[in-house]
Structure formats: structure tokens, C-alpha cells
Curated annotation (Swiss-Prot):
GO biological process terms, semicolon-separated: defense response to virus; maintenance of CRISPR repeat elements
Gene3D superfamilies according to UniProt: 3.30.70.2660
Job of this protein: CRISPR (clustered regularly interspaced short palindromic repeat) is an adaptive immune system that provides protection against mobile genetic elements (viruses, transposable elements and conjugative plasmids). CRISPR clusters contain spacers, sequences complementary to antecedent mobile elements, and target invading nucleic acids. CRISPR clusters are transcribed and processed into CRISPR RNA (crRNA). This protein is a sequence-specific endonuclease that cleaves pre-crRNA at G21 into mature crRNA.
E.C. number: 3.1.-.-
CDD domains for this protein: Cas5_I-C
GO molecular function: endonuclease activity; RNA binding
Note accompanying the cofactor annotation: Does not require a metal cofactor.
Protein name: CRISPR pre-crRNA endoribonuclease Cas5d
Matching NCBIfam families: cas_Cas5d, CRISPR_cas5
Lineage of producing organism: Bacteria, Pseudomonadati, Pseudomonadota, Gammaproteobacteria, Pasteurellales
Record-stated family: Belongs to the CRISPR-associated protein Cas5 family. Subtype I-C/Dvulg subfamily.
Length: 225
């Protein structure tokens, strides 16, 4: 498939936060399609394209660890934002993290590795001379050189993601999952956010089959809002 890319990613820790956990972060069992898309976009993205995640290969056993992380205690208040808008100045619209830092517990993933299989689609912002092949080749060149617009991360910025492009003719890295770990119902998982319709989250039933999660299309019937 000429329009396909496969990217091997790995890291010491990861946290793909479940939205239903309000106070302390708890990670999903594996990377979400939206987080995978974010990693690809950190390497190459333009308004002309969207990355579509097709498959996620889970290469290492799912292991959790409890840690404590420094987080900002509160968001900037709505009244401060409204005041800045009225004044037409953002001079006072800031927060000092040293004054509002809190330690919070988090349940994160340890020693993770995946292969992201994805393709690109053109958006309405694409120029007449643009096509998916052009952007796929740009992505491959950047990934081979280790280039990125910003450091890809495993859910949160303090957990960097290392990456390596897998050529179309190269085999996938060997999975370290045991026989009993290859097939597993992972429950409902965030697919992505529909930014064009009120930032609505979409969810799908994630199932690990032979170590692979098949990601349905964003507007498929099995994807729920």
C-alpha cells in the first residue's frame, strides 16, 4: 500500500489518560488512536493532510506502575480570561506553576512499544499540486532522519516517545507478548475528538486480536459518541 506508513515507537513510560478519571491520572491499557495520530503529526503534519490510524501493534506486555507527578493545581479562571478579553490585553493572563504546583498520584504504563500503521488523507485545505504520496514521502524522509517538529510523547510530555520508520519491505519487530496476552478485550477507548462538531469525543470497543488492534474508521457505525 503506497499510501501507508508503519512507525515503531517505544518508551520507558506512557500515560494515555482515561477521561472518566477526574482527579488522578489513570492510563488506558494501550496507546489510543488519537495519541498515535499526535505522534505522527509531531514528525510531519500540514493543514493539507490528516493522519488516519489503521492498526496498532502491541509489542510488549501491558504493565502498570503507580507514580507521583508534579501537576498544575488549577486552570486559569474564567473571570481572568473574560477580563483579559475586555481589556484586550493578555498581560496578566498567566499562572506561575511554582506557586500552584501539586503532587498527584498517577497509574502509568511501564516499558511500552507499539507499531503504528496509518495512512494520510487530503483535507479541504490541500493545494491543487498536493497529494498523499508527496506527504507520505516527506514523512518517511523525516522519520528516517529522526526529525520532528516537536518531541513526540507517550501521552504526556515528560514521557518521550522514541521512533523508527519501518520500511514497506521490512518485517515488524518481534512481539514480546505471551500466548495468553495476544487476545484481550480492552473495553471502550477514546478514538479521537471531533473538532468540527463541538469537540465531541468518539469511543470504540478496543479488542486485541493476535496482538493487533484494528482501528475502525472515525465515522464507522461501531464508533460511538
Amino acid at each position: 500500500m503506497a499510501n501507508r506508513i508503519r512507525l515503531h515507537i517505544w518508551g520507558d513510560y506512557a500515560c494515555f489518560t482515561r477521561p472518566e478519571m477526574k482527579v488522578e491520572r489513570v492510563s488506558y491499557d494501550v496507546i489510543t488512536p488519537s495519541a498515535a495520530r499526535g505522534i505522527l503529526s509531531a514528525i510531519h503534519w500540514k493543514p493539507a493532510i490528516n493522519w488516519v490510524i489503521d492498526k496498532i501493534y502491541v509489542l510488549k506486555p501491558i504493565r502498570f506502575e503507580s507514580v507521583r507527578r508534579n501537576e498544575l493545581g488549577a486552570k486559569i479562571s474564567e473571570s481572568k480570561v473574560s477580563g483579559a478579553m475586555k481589556r484586550k490585553s493578555v498581560a496578566d493572563l498567566y499562572t506561575v506553576i511554582e506557586d500552584d504546583r501539586q503532587q498527584r498520584a498517577a497509574t502509568v504504563l511501564k516499558d511500552v512499544a507499539y507499531v503504528i500503521e496509518a495512512h494520510a488523507v487530503m483535507t479541504s485545505k490541500a493545494g491543487v499540486d498536493e497529494n498523499t504520496t508527496k506527504h507520505i514521502e516527506m514523512f518517511k524522509r523525516r522519520a528516517l532522519k529522526g526529525q520532528c517538529f516537536q518531541q513526540p510523547c507517550m501521552g504526556v510530555r515528560e514521557f518521550p516517545a522514541h521512533f523508527a520508520l519501518i520500511d514497506d519491505n521490512d518485517p515488524l519487530p518481534l512481539s514480546q507478548l505471551s500466548e495468553s496476552e495476544f487476545n484481550r478485550d480492552l473495553g471502550w477507548m477514546l478514538h479521537d475528538i471531533d473538532f468540527e462538531h463541538g469537540n465531541t469525543p468518539h469511543f470504540f470497543r478496543a479488542e486485541l486480536k493476535n496482538g493487533v488492534i484494528d482501528v475502525p474508521p472515525f465515522y464507522a457505525e461501531e464508533v460511538k459518541r
